[in-house]
Swiss-Prot record:
It comes from Petrotoga mobilis (strain DSM 10674 / SJ95). One of its GO terms (biological process) is negative regulation of translation. The gene is rplM. The keyword RNA-binding does not apply. GO terms for cellular component: cytosolic large ribosomal subunit. This is Large ribosomal subunit protein uL13. The keyword Ribonucleoprotein applies.
Length: 151
């Protein structure tokens, strides 16, 4: 085979990565659809320079986290569990309790579940900023407001 006909595979390099900031309003979006789109942006899968083993994703700011909705009857049935590692250390909290106490954690946990189960996911999750209400402290970064339908 002639080597001039074969294109070498492109691998993103650290200096080639340009990170953008995106703003997403979570009001009236379904949790799963929103989380999958956010995970795609954090991983950089929306870019043509995507490389699986390099963190090439962008920053995402999510506002109005308390106004997220779930499909069907999950609002009454969804339970969040965590385990301390000790006997009797299983704690359960319902979606409604979580929404009243920590609404930002709902989106963070959903996105975390859709990220790859690697050490790289921990670094990608640091680029997710979730806030209750319409205000956020990232005005200086000039985040681009996007609709999740366009991703």
């Amino acid at each position: 085979m002639n080597s001039k006909l074969v294109q070498p595979s492109y691998t993103a390099k650290k200096e080639d990565i340009k990170r953008e900031w995106f703003l997403i309003d979570a009001k009236d979006y379904t949790l799963g659809r929103l989380a999958s789109r956010i995970a795609k942006i954090l991983q950089g899968k929306h870019k043509p320079t995507y490389t699986p083993y390099i963190d090439s994703g962008d920053f995402v700011v999510v506002v109005n986290a308390e106004k997220i909705k779930l499909s069907k009857d999950k609002k009454e049935n969804k339970i969040y569990r965590r385990y301390s590692g000790y006997p009797g250390g299983l704690k359960e909290i319902s979606f409604e309790q979580m929404q009243s106490k920590h609404p930002e954690r709902i989106i963070q946990l959903a996105v975390k579940g859709m990220m790859p189960k690697t050490i790289l996911a921990k670094h990608m999750m640091k680029k997710l900023k979730v806030y209750v209400g319409p205000d956020h402290p990232h005005q200086a970064q000039n985040p681009k407001e996007i609709k999740i339908e366009n991703i």
